[in-house]
Amino acid sequence: MGFQVWQKGLCVLCFSLIFICGVIGEETTIVKIEENPVAQTDENYVCATLDLWPPTKCNYGNCPWGKSSFLNLDLNNNIIRNAVKEFAPLKLRFGGTLQDRLVYQTSRDEPCDSTFYNNTNLILDFSHACLSLDRWDEINQFILETGSEAVFGLNALRGKTVEIKGIIKDGQYLGETTTAVGEWDYSNSKFLIEYSLKKGYKHIRGWTLGNELGGHTLFIGVSPEDYANDAKKLHELVKEIYQDQGTMPLIIAPGAIFDLEWYTEFIDRTPELHVATHHMYNLGSGGDDALKDVLLTASFFDEATKSMYEGLQKIVNRPGTKAVAWIGEAGGAFNSGQDGISNTFINGFWYLNMLGYSALLDTKTFCRQTLTGGNYGLLQTGTYIPNPDYYSALLWHRLMGSKVLKTEIVGTKNVYIYAHCAKKSNGITMLVLNHDGESSVKISLDPSKYGSKREEYHLTPVNNNLQSRLVKLNGELLHLDPSGVIPALNPVEKDNSKQLEVAPYSFMFVHLPGPTMFSACEKPAGK
């Protein structure tokens, strides 16, 4: 396929790829977009989590969780409901560290205390808590009424014994390791799954076993052999319970920090697994004063991040494995994120880049930590007012289709561009992130290849303050109306004979509805 690149008055004609010509300051930048998709995501790729941390969860003197746990969150709040409905469907992952301390009420006559109490003498530093049947019904009613899908995290430690052993190597004491051994007691989980089916909760997309008990363990570890045996039990259990339903929910595990050796053994031993999940906090600590620089320089694209993605893809692509890869939890900075960073415009440089990069490497779903709770929520804790990343997530969901196109940029290191087949047209959607604080990105589009018109969604911070919790779309402030309705996200239509321009330190989604030269993006009639 032909393309033309204009550079200082020179027209160069080449073939096989579709090129775009861009200008960064005085530099000419060439953007290459391959015509054939290199990966495919789920249609509802964007996912968000609801955790279990209580109000007493604090990091660095900051206690940002409030009543955001799915045990105590106000599920009738209009803003929350409206925010979730805008995705319809939004994949919601229920779980987190304390899911392995959660038990499920089996009779309404049983006492059921839903509070996790701090106690450093106990596993994970918290007491057990209980999910009541009434609360489970409320959660499922919320999922149904908001048009969502649920992925629920089961307690994988029930029945196991925790052992603490010293680590000695070459005569030196290296600390302690905490391991959970023994068989998984699945009786409580079995009740919850059976109860859910009897109640007709068909919006449960999958059941996840455990949280961060494998891979690079942070608190308690389970061996890959034991974890595989437990996952097999869960598969047998769900298959038996759903045997008359035609389809069954997904079996998802392990939801851990990736470790190549551990994941390889676990997945090799678990051919029944549908989804292999890993968690990502590649910005480092939420207490890091240098977090702003990490975001602006995109230094989170380090070798550890790349090897994690590539390693998991190699495992799931091995013969005999049917599992696909999800990011089951990604908050950027661990320990609740950082106030003034994770909940502001600047965090979009991490979030949007990771959405794009993950999709390129055939990740099917990307679950943001959190919908609300901590400093990294898409919605602010307590007020539920959308943070800037909420609008970025919603635009991605609406504009970026499942087919992923590979891009290559020649001429600058400060710009990242991702491209997908468009969600609702036969064209493509590009996402352009300008990490340059001084110069705009200017890109020329050939109307003969991309059509005559485009739709721009340009996101910029209020008053050019990168740490603003407010964001503008095409120069207009985005805010809720008095009744908590999410604002319309309307594009500006531009003529493709004119360059598109992305301001310094900003992002832009560009929808090119076509007709384009991307035949792979053409949808069947009526779709």
UniProtKB/Swiss-Prot annotation:
It catalyses: baicalin + H2O = baicalein + D-glucuronate + H(+). The active site is at residues 212, 329. Pfam families: Glyco_hydro_79n (PF03662). It is an enzyme of class 3 (hydrolase). Disulfide bonds: none annotated. It comes from the Eukaryota. SUPFAM superfamilies: (Trans)glycosidases (SSF51445). Changing residue 281 to A: Loss of activity. Residues 1-25 form the signal peptide. The keyword Glycoprotein does not apply. One of its GO terms (molecular function) is beta-glucuronidase activity. InterPro entries: Glyco_hydro_79, Glycoside_hydrolase_SF. One of its GO terms (cellular component) is membrane. Optimum pH is 7.0-8.0. Keywords: Hydrolase, Signal. Its EC number is 3.2.1.167. Homotetramer. Belongs to the glycosyl hydrolase 79 family. Beta-glucuronidase involved in the initiation of H(2)O(2) metabolism via the production of baicalein. Unable to use glycyrrhizin, gypsogenin-3-O-D-glucuronide, luteolin-7-O-D-glucoside and apigenin-7-O-D-glucoside as substrates. This is Baicalin-beta-D-glucuronidase. It comes from Scutellaria baicalensis. The gene is SGUS.
